[in-house]
């Protein structure tokens, strides 16, 4: 079956694993997914991200993070720009997720970065997803 939106599939796998308290989730790897996962790690939403070679495209193993009493660190993940409806934001229009508590992930001309990094660099781009 052909996958029309691999990023949405990636986010859904993370969301589903988080909802049932799995410690890790494996997703087919790509450069974009790896960059998004690294942003999630740098922002403190996941514990670790590792690339696993499997003689195909590879796998990303993402270790999810939970609080001391197993409370979820990731409350929600949402795909914004979809194949059927792309969403772009100029540098002045970069959205704040939950008033700054969440993170927007953008694809800019300088690569994939968080909303804070894009504002600092003065770049706009395609709004890929929100995580909070």
Curated annotation (Swiss-Prot):
* Gene Ontology CC entries for this record: ribonucleoprotein complex; ribosome
- Alphabetical keyword list: Ribonucleoprotein, Ribosomal protein, RNA-binding, rRNA-binding
GO MF term list: rRNA binding; structural constituent of ribosome
The record lists its disulfide bonds as: none
Question: Which superkingdom is the protein from?
Answer: Bacteria
Q: Which SUPFAM superfamilies does this chain map to?
A: Ribosomal protein S8
Please provide the Gene Ontology terms (biological process) for this protein.
translation
Q: How does it assemble?
A: Part of the 30S ribosomal subunit. Contacts proteins S5 and S12.
Function description: One of the primary rRNA binding proteins, it binds directly to 16S rRNA central domain where it helps coordinate assembly of the platform of the 30S subunit.
Entry's family note: Belongs to the universal ribosomal protein uS8 family.
Q: What is this protein called?
A: Small ribosomal subunit protein uS8
| Protein source organism | Heliobacterium modesticaldum (strain ATCC 51547 / Ice1)
Q: Gene name on record? A: rpsH
């Amino acid at each position: 079956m052909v996958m029309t939106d691999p990023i949405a599939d990636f986010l859904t796998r993370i969301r589903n694993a988080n909802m049932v308290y799995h410690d890790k989730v494996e997703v087919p790897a790509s450069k974009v997914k790896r960059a998004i996962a690294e942003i999630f790690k740098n922002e403190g939403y996941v514990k670790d991200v590792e690339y696993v070679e499997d003689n195909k495209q590879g796998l990303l193993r993402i270790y999810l993070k939970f609080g001391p009493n197993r409370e979820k660190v990731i409350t929600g993940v949402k795909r914004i720009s979809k194949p059927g409806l792309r969403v772009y934001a100029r540098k002045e229009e970069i959205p704040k997720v939950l008033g700054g508590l969440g993170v927007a992930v953008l694809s800019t001309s300088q690569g994939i970065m968080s909303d804070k990094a894009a504002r600092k660099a003065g770049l706009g781009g395609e709004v890929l997803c929100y995580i909070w």
